[in-house]
Amino acid sequence: MVASLSPQDMLNLAAYYSTQKPKPDTAKDQVLALTGQKIFRGGVQGTGVPACASCHGPQGQGIPAQFPRLAGQHADYTYAQLNTFRLGERANDPAKMMRSIAAKMTDADMKAVASYIQGLR
């Protein structure tokens, strides 16, 4: 499809698409997202799961060079990353911080948090 475009056409398309604002993704299940909001802001009582916001910020903006931005990540991606931490397949977290947190989270906790994060901006 793009093979027939001239170099100028490609530049024009690039200029056009670079001005487009991404549409925010919203949670598909609002009840799940509300549960995720509670976990994100307050952790899971009695399990040792801290509030995500304590490291990643109240809006998921992160702290550069320390804790990554989470806001706006797709729910499937966030869930997959939490699960790889839980399984020990991902190990780029200093002092095993995320691995120890994810190990204490249920599958439902992870899905709820992922759903909430998707709607953050």
Task: Please annotate each region the language model reported.
Residues 31, 47-50, 93:
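Alpha-helix N-cap and coil->helix boundary residues
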